Structure formats: structure tokens, C-alpha cells
Swiss-Prot record:
Principal subcellular localization: cytoplasm
Species per Swiss-Prot/TrEMBL record: Pediococcus pentosaceus (strain ATCC 25745 / CCUG 21536 / LMG 10740 / 183-1w)
PROSITE patterns: RNASE_H_2
Name of the protein: Ribonuclease HII
Enzyme Commission number, as recorded: 3.1.26.4
Function noted in UniProt: Endonuclease that specifically degrades the RNA of RNA-DNA hybrids.
Protein encoded by which gene: rnhB
Residue ranges occupied by any RNase H type-2 domain in the UniProt entry: 70-255
Lineage of the organism: Bacteria, Bacillati, Bacillota, Bacilli, Lactobacillales
GO biological process: DNA replication, removal of RNA primer; mismatch repair
Length: 255
């Protein structure tokens, strides 16, 4: 009879509820074995639900592909509500072989998982484009128009020409057929991938600014108006990367 430690190792290669090993072990009276079985069954069910959710987020892309539209780009932005730094957008084109089931709305993921997925998306995507609109441009044209400009730039930086765009929330003036939707990063795998790329790219950028402008906590708040950030404004004033039209930044400008 196998030991519980040996059974635990054997279960590592079990991926379905009807696996013969699970059926066989269900007759084992040992409490430790039954505990392992329950844990494995829960793990399999969680993986199945994750896979089903992943496939559901691929629905929009598959519908377009089935109609001969092969190059579909998902677009998302990050940083619209920040007091400092640029707004960053990403455009990501995937194909049917893409299988990173953890890809989801970047806000739902840990920073560690985002970093891991970011590297894999850059490798596995058909193409990735980044668009960056500076804080100066944001002050000049407003955040919505700056976001649209960054989205155009992201699409222009793809190394393929997409036939259709899937965009989260913002109806960017790009002369390509598009579908604009709210909460797109939870409905489209391409938009979700774009949300991860944009988020991680911008986080890296803001961490580099933290070294240039210490005292604001940019490495942690990435430009959002946290208590530490506001205290930094009170103590050190406005930096060259602050958005001067965003409250409360104007309060700290030298008159």
C-alpha cells in the first residue's frame, strides 16, 4: 500500500475528476488520503472554472476570427486618474494559440503575477504596441483626449495592421472598425492582455521616476494621490512630471 506521501506525489499528475487513480483512492479508508482527494477535487474544479472563464473571455475574438477577421487588437489604458506621470495605453494582438489562462483584468491580479504575465504576453502575442502621452500633453488637451492620442500611438506601434479593435470604454478616433465596451478587460482576453501590458509598463516607468523624484512614493503609488504623495507635494512642491491641471496639484504651484 502506497504511503500518503507517495500518493501526494502521484496526485500531481491527476488533472480530471474521472482519473482512475482518484476512483481507486476513493476506496482508501485513511483520513489523510481522503483529505488529499478532497483537496485535489477542489483544485481540479477551480482549474475547470478558470479555464471556462478564460474561454468565455475569448468569445469576441473567436467571433471575429470566424468571420475572416484575423488581426484583432485589444486596447486598454492605465493612469488616467493619477496626479503625476503619463497615461499609458497598450494594444495587443493575439491568435488562437494563446493559452495564458491567468490573463484577466490587471486590477484583479497580484503585482507578481502581472509581472510574470507581462513577460509571457510580450513573447506569445502576435504583436504588442505601447502608447504614452505625457503629463504636459494631458494638461494641454485634457485626459480623455490624451488617452485617445495614446491609443492611436499604441495601434501605430504594432508591427501588424489590425482589422478590428476591441477597446475598453474609450471611443478613440482610429479609422479601423472597432467595438467599444465598458469593463472590456473582463470581457475580452485581448483587452485584458493590453491592461496588463499597460499597467506593468507604466509601473516600471513610475518606479524610475521615484529615483529621480524621491519623497513622493512614486514606486508605491505610481502617481495616484495617496497620503504620502500629497505630503510630498506639501514638502517638496510640484515636479516636472506632475499634471498641473489635476487637483490638488495647482495648490502647490509656486505663485
Amino acid at each position: 500500500m502506497a504511503t500518503i506521501k507517495e500518493i501526494k506525489t502521484q496526485l500531481l499528475s491527476v488533472y480530471t475528476l474521472d482519473d482512475p487513480l482518484l476512483v481507486e483512492l476513493s476506496e482508501d479508508p485513511r483520513t489523510g488520503v481522503q483529505r488529499l482527494i478532497k483537496h485535489k477535487q477542489k483544485e481540479i474544479n477551480q482549474l475547470r472554472l478558470k479555464e471556462e472563464a478564460f474561454q468565455a473571455r475569448f468569445t469576441l475574438e473567436r467571433e471575429l476570427w470566424s468571420n475572416g477577421i484575423d488581426l484583432v487588437a485589444g486596447i486598454d489604458e492605465v493612469g488616467r486618474g493619477c496626479l503625476a506621470g503619463p497615461v499609458v495605453t497598450a494594444s495587443v494582438v493575439l491568435d488562437e494559440t494563446f493559452d495564458l489562462i491567468d490573463v484577466n483584468d490587471s486590477k484583479q491580479l497580484s503585482s507578481e503575477l502581472r509581472e510574470e504575465l507581462y513577460a509571457k504576453i510580450l513573447t506569445e502575442a502576435v504583436s504588442v504596441g505601447i502608447g504614452v502621452c505625457s503629463n504636459q500633453k494631458i494638461d494641454e488637451v485634457n485626459i480623455l483626449n490624451a488617452t485617445k492620442l495614446a491609443m492611436r500611438e499604441a495601434v501605430g506601434n504594432l508591427n501588424v495592421t489590425p482589422q478590428h479593435l476591441l477597446i475598453d470604454a474609450v471611443n478613440a478616433p482610429i479609422e479601423i472598425p472597432k467595438t467599444v465596451m465598458f469593463k472590456g478587460d473582463s470581457k475580452s482576453i485581448s483587452i485584458a492582455a493590453a491592461s496588463i501590458v499597460a499597467k506593468v509598463y507604466r509601473d516600471h516607468l513610475m518606479r524610475s521616476y521615484a529615483a529621480l523624484y524621491p519623497g513622493y512614493g512614486f514606486d508605491k503609488n505610481v502617481g495616484y494621490g495617496t497620503k504620502q504623495h500629497i505630503e510630498g507635494l506639501k514638502t517638496y512642491g510640484v515636479t516636472p512630471i506632475h499634471r498641473q491641471t489635476f487637483e490638488p496639484v495647482p495648490e502647490f504651484l509656486i505663485k
